[in-house]
A protein has these predicted regions:
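Conserved, mostly hydrophobic/aromatic
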Residues: 4, 37, 100
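Catalytic beta/alpha-barrel core
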Residues: 6-15, 101-104
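Active-site-adjacent beta->alpha loops and helix N-cap segments on the catalytic face
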Residues: 12-27, 107-117
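Electropositive phosphate-/nucleotide-binding environments in soluble metabolic enzymes
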Residues: 16, 79-86, 105-108
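A short pocket-lining beta-strand/turn micro-motif at the edge of beta-sheets
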Residues: 31-33, 96-101
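Active-site pocket-lining/capping segments in soluble small-molecule metabolic enzymes
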Residues: 24, 28-82, 87, 118-131, ...
Length: 136
């Protein structure tokens, strides 16, 4: 913070409650810069296992069931991973998140699908912020 940080990006997570706890801890520590939530849409079971191991990320039972159900169907797995990420983003925006960072691993298809499903949430939030600043 002393070096001039003006925003943060969280590591990935699959349960929003962990991000909300992180936000609270940052606030208690006096960190008052915007924090973007790090969301990684999962496209295969191996990817989840690797990231969970690497980052110490908890994989909730709800998500484990999705992984098991679609592990032999790559297209369905990709679509379920995108849907799960979109649900996370909707919840985050509803709770006033400062922003979202997508860890798409350079997969433009996933980025495009998530953008199409969520851009209106950000446009209405951004428009509301612009309207509020214009009326001040």
């Amino acid at each position: 913070m002393d070096a001039g940080v003006n925003h943060l990006i969280s590591q990935l997570f699959f349960e929003n409650k962990h991000f909300y706890i992180f936000q609270e801890r940052c606030a208690l520590a006096g960190i008052d810069v915007p924090i973007a939530a790090g969301i990684m849409p999962v496209i295969n079971k191996r990817q989840v296992q690797k990231m969970a191991s690497l980052c110490g990320v908890n994989v909730p039972k709800k998500f484990q069931k999705i992984l098991e159900k679609y592990e032999d169907n790559p297209i369905a797995m990709r679509d379920a991973g995108i849907a799960y990420a979109v649900d996370q983003i909707v919840d985050l925006v509803t709770h006033g998140v400062d922003g979202v960072h997508l860890y798409t691993m350079n997969n433009s298809y996933i980025a495009r699908k998530i953008y199409k499903a969520t851009h209106s949430l950000f446009e209405s939030t951004h428009k509301g912020a612009k309207d509020a600043s214009n009326s001040a």
